[in-house]
Every structure is written in C-alpha cells, then in structure tokens.
C-alpha cells in the first residue's frame, strides 16, 4: 500500500484544488510549502460495516498541530469510488499567494456497491496496478472435477489475508482480468477420471460433486481370468464381488503329471539300487500320461546280448534294455510324452533332436542326401535309402530279363531254321539234276557221236563221281514233288543237251 500517497497527490492536483480554495477562510500566512500525508485505516475481515476516518493538520512549517475541525464542512469532501472498492476524499494545496489555515483532509472507505463498474475516474495504469494488488475475499464456488493451474493459483490467493478494500461478488471479472478463472472447465481439456480407485478420507471435503455412476462397493473388481494362468495361486482369493465366481482351488483341478525330471533319468542310468528303482518305478507309474505300447515282436531276441545292455526301462510293462543312457532317455520320453524340442517356425514339438533337425529342413528346403545313381536329392537319409532300393529292384528286373532272353536264344539254336535249308535246295537241285538225267536217260544211247566216247574219260568220270557224295543229304532230303517236277521237265532239257557240244558240258 505504499503507492497510495502518490495516488492521493495526483487526485489532489486533478480534483480537490477548487473545492479547498472555495472552502478556505481568511489567509493566515503567505508562502511556505505544505506537505501532505495520507492516513488510512484498514478494516479486518475483508471490510466490515461503518466507515473509518482519520485527520491530520500541519502548520506552514510542516509540523503537526492540534487544530479544530469546525471550519470544515461535509460538503467540501468528495467521495471517489473505484469499482465499489475504495472511496477517497482528497484535498488540494492552498493558494501559494496567501497563508491558508491549517489544512485538514480525511479519507473514507465506502462499502456501498455501485450499480455499474464503469467508473473512469482513475486512469488505466492505476486501474491495472490496483487490479494486481487486490484479491478476492469470497471466491465463487464452482463445481469442477479436475483442478487447473489457474484455479489453484486463485485458491492460494484466497487464503492470503484480505485487504481493506471490499469487492462486490456480482461483478469481479474486470479486476481479475490478469488471472482468468475457469468456473466451468471444458471436459475435453480436463477429462474426468473414469473411476475412483481409493475413496477420499472422511476429514477431507470434496469440492466437486461425485460422478453420476455409483462407485464400487466391494473394493477392486477382479476380472475373470482362466485358472490355468495361475498354477501357483491358491483358492482363497475373495476380492471380487459376491456375484463373481472365486478362483478354483488346486483340489478341484485335475492333477497333470509333470515331465520326467533329469534326476530321475540319471538315477535310472546309474542303477543306484533296488530300493530306489522300486520307488522310482512307482513314481513313473503315477506319472504316466499314456499307456506304454507293447513291442511289435516281444519274443524276438535282440542283437546285443543282455549283459551288454545295462540300461533297462523302468516301466514294468516294458522290457526294453539299452546299451547307452541316451537311448534310454529317448525311450523314456515315449512313456512320458515329453517333447522338449520345439520348432521356432511352426511351434511344433518333437521328442528327439534329430526329428527336429529333419523337420527344420522342410522349412529351409535343404536336401543334403543325394542318390548315387540318378542324383536325386533328399532331406532325410532314410528317404534316400528307400529310393536306392527302387534302383536295386530295377536292376534285378533287368538281370532277370537278360537271363530269360539268353535262355530263349539257346532254345531256339537247338532247332534248324527252315530259312537256312531253303537257300541251298535250289542250287543243289538245279545244277546236278541235268547231269544224271543226261546219263540215265534212254536217249543217251541214241547219240552215237564220237563225242559220246569222251564222257567215260577218267577226268570227266572223276569229276562227276565226286559230285554226288558232296551233296548226299540234300539229294536225299528232297525226294519231293519238286524233284519229280525237275524230272518231268527234263524232257525239254534233254532236247537242249542234245544240242550241247561236249566242250560246253565240260565247262558246266
């Protein structure tokens, strides 16, 4: 409030000088400077009823003195009100030419509200200065669900001790223009919370109404979650409302046997003792998921003798024995149904690692096994082995076909072919046939020519004598009609031989 003397001086210069000049009496002295001071009284509690007035008198030398107030009238004072907040009565300096009596002025606070707040007595800088100093004595109550920074600042200002100026509650927006308030905040900017997780304490009062929907009665709402997600949870949870079903206990659930522990497998592998074997056998009997399958050939003896297969299956209904502990481990997974190897691509589980390896090749397309005969590739070695058997069967079939063909050829070679005998027959019958007929025919004696005597020569006789033994078979085999035909046609040939000379016969 240190700025009020300056405000009063400005008001003295503007409004109060004519009034005090008219109200002054006879001059008592001339010259001298009168200094004015302000006296203000503050009313506690934000301004109470009534008015407080203070007065002070000064002599021309500036020293205070006791002077009566009868020479001042009430008409000489002017009430100045700013927004119904403060009314000041200011006095002006007396004339500088005459000596005035001691000046007395009073300041008064008016508590009467004005119908309008458009008072323009004070300039704008003073108005903004006062608006920054005055705080609201009784802030309006507004329902809001979320506090804002501006609202929190106004609430902190309301807790400060109020000033002497009284502010009406009906028109306070011009004064508080520097710090705007939000009586009804927008729900888009300040959304309401969905629910109250914890109710407020009994001592704290809510400054906003509760939400329209009722709050939860039984505490937090426990959602219905499947039982298999809480394998270790006990069945004593009672946080939900009565209409909700509590979690099922472990007693009501089916006991699923666990997978084969590694310690159990090692105990079987090391053959710790007969008592341990009996106890572990009982545990295995209780943990079986599916019944043990019987052997395909139970009476068939194994290739390895029993003393070389120390690892026996602990299941009573299974008499399998193994020479290696890892083989027993894989076999036990058949009884327990354990599949510890999982494909990361299709999430399929396998009981053996080699099965997983071959399965992954179906995703990658890898085929490392190739056929040695045709070059075809396979992802598994057993597939290549099965394919190789196809080539072996084809080879056996080809061998069988070759044997059949050779046997058929040998059987055909034992019988003479008619084609082979057909070719020498005309040659044998055509050439030697005219010779004997020429000698055996009765017409041979009818040739008394001296050339006839040339036939029994040793050279001719020996040549003709050697001809019949060279072809005995052909002559004997062809005692057919063809021969008879040759003889039947020999009549014409005999006529031709009659014309032949002995020299042509020798050439033949």
Swiss-Prot record:
GO cellular component: chromatin; cytoplasm; nucleoplasm; nucleus
Keywords: Activator, Biological rhythms, Cytoplasm, DNA-binding, Isopeptide bond, Metal-binding, Nucleus, Repeat, Transcription, Transcription regulation, Ubl conjugation, Zinc, Zinc-finger
GO molecular function: DNA binding; DNA-binding transcription activator activity, RNA polymerase II-specific; DNA-binding transcription factor activity; DNA-binding transcription factor activity, RNA polymerase II-specific; double-stranded DNA binding; double-stranded methylated DNA binding; enzyme binding; hemi-methylated DNA-binding
SMART domains: ZnF_C2H2
Residue location of crosslink Glycyl lysine isopeptide (Lys-Gly) (interchain with G-Cter in SUMO2): 278
Basic residues biased stretches: 386-396
Primary location class: nucleus
Region (7 X 8 AA tandem repeats of [TS](2)-[FY]-[PS]-S-P-[GSAV]-X): 413-468
GO BP term (any one): positive regulation of interleukin-1 beta production
Site (Interaction with DNA): 309, 320, 324, 330, 348, 352, 376, 380, 386
Record flagged with keyword Cell wall biogenesis/degradation: no
Free-text comment about domains: Binds to DNA motifs with the sequence 5'-GCG(T/G)GGGCG-3' via its C2H2-type zinc fingers. The first, most N-terminal zinc finger binds to the 3'-GCG motif, the middle zinc finger interacts with the central TGG motif, and the C-terminal zinc finger binds to the 5'-GCG motif. Binds double-stranded target DNA, irrespective of the cytosine methylation status. Has reduced affinity for target DNA where the cytosines have been oxidized to 5-hydroxymethylcytosine. Does not bind target DNA where the cytosines have been oxidized to 5-formylcytosine or 5-carboxylcytosine.
Described function: Transcriptional regulator. Recognizes and binds to the DNA sequence 5'-GCG(T/G)GGGCG-3'(EGR-site) in the promoter region of target genes. Binds double-stranded target DNA, irrespective of the cytosine methylation status. Regulates the transcription of numerous target genes, and thereby plays an important role in regulating the response to growth factors, DNA damage, and ischemia. Plays a role in the regulation of cell survival, proliferation and cell death. Activates expression of p53/TP53 and TGFB1, and thereby helps prevent tumor formation.
Family: Belongs to the EGR C2H2-type zinc-finger protein family.
Name of the featured protein: Early growth response protein 1
Organism in which the protein naturally occurs: Rattus norvegicus
Higher taxonomy: Eukaryota, Metazoa, Chordata, Craniata, Vertebrata
């Amino acid at each position: 409030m240190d700025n009020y003397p300056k405000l009063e001086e400005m008001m003295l210069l503007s409004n109060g000088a004519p009034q005090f000049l008219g109200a002054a009496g006879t001059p008592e002295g001339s010259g001298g400077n009168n200094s004015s001071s302000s006296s203000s009284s503050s009313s506690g509690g934000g301004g109470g009823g009534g008015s407080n007035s203070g007065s002070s008198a000064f002599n021309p030398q500036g020293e205070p003195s006791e002077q009566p107030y009868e020479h001042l009238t009430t008409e000489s004072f002017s009430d100045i009100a700013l927004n119904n907040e403060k009314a000041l009565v200011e006095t002006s300096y007396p004339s500088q030419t005459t000596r005035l009596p001691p000046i007395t002025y009073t300041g008064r606070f008016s508590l009467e509200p004005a119908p309008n707040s458009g008072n323009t007595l004070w300039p704008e800088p003073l108005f903004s200065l006062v608006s920054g100093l005055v705080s609201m004595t009784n802030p309006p109550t507004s329902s809001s669900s979320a506090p804002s920074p501006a609202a929190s600042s106004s609430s902190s200002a309301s807790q400060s001790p109020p000033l002497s100026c009284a502010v009406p509650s009906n028109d306070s927006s011009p004064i508080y223009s520097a710090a705007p308030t939000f009586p009804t905040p927008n729900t888009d900017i300040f959304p309401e919370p969905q629910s109250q997780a914890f109710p407020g304490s009994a001592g704290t009062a809510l400054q906003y109404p509760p939400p329209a929907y009722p709050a939860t009665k039984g505490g937090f709402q426990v959602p219905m979650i499947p039982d298999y997600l809480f394998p270790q949870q006990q069945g004593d949870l009672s946080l939900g409302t009565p209409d909700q079903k509590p979690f099922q206990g472990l007693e009501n659930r089916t006991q699923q046997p666990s997978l084969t522990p590694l310690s159990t497998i090692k105990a079987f592998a090391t053959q710790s003792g007969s008592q341990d074997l009996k106890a572990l056998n009982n545990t295995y009997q209780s943990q079986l998921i599916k019944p043990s399958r019987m052997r395909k050939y139970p009476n068939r003896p194994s290739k390895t003798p029993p003393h070389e297969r120390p690892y026996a299956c602990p299941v009573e209904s299974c008499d399998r024995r193994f020479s290696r502990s890892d083989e027993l481990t894989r076999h036990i997974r058949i009884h327990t149904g354990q599949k510890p190897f999982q494909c990361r691509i299709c999430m399929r589980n396998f009981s053996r690692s080699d099965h997983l390896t071959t399965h992954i090749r179906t995703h990658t397309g890898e085929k490392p096994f190739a056929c040695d005969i045709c070059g075809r590739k396979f992802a598994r070695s057993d597939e290549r082995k099965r394919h190789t058997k196809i080539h072996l069967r084809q080879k056996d079939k080809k061998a069988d076909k070759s044997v059949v063909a050779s046997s058929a050829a040998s059987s055909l070679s034992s019988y003479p072919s008619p084609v082979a005998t057909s070719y020498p027959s005309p040659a044998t019958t055509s050439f030697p046939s005219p010779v004997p007929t020429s000698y055996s025919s009765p017409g041979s004696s009818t040739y008394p020519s001296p050339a006839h005597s040339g036939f029994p020569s040793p050279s001719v006789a020996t040549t003709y004598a050697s001809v019949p033994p060279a072809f005995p078979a052909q002559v004997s085999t062809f005692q057919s009609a063809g021969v008879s035909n040759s003889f039947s046609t020999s009549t014409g040939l005999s006529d031709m031989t009659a014309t032949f000379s002995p020299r042509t016969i020798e050439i033949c």
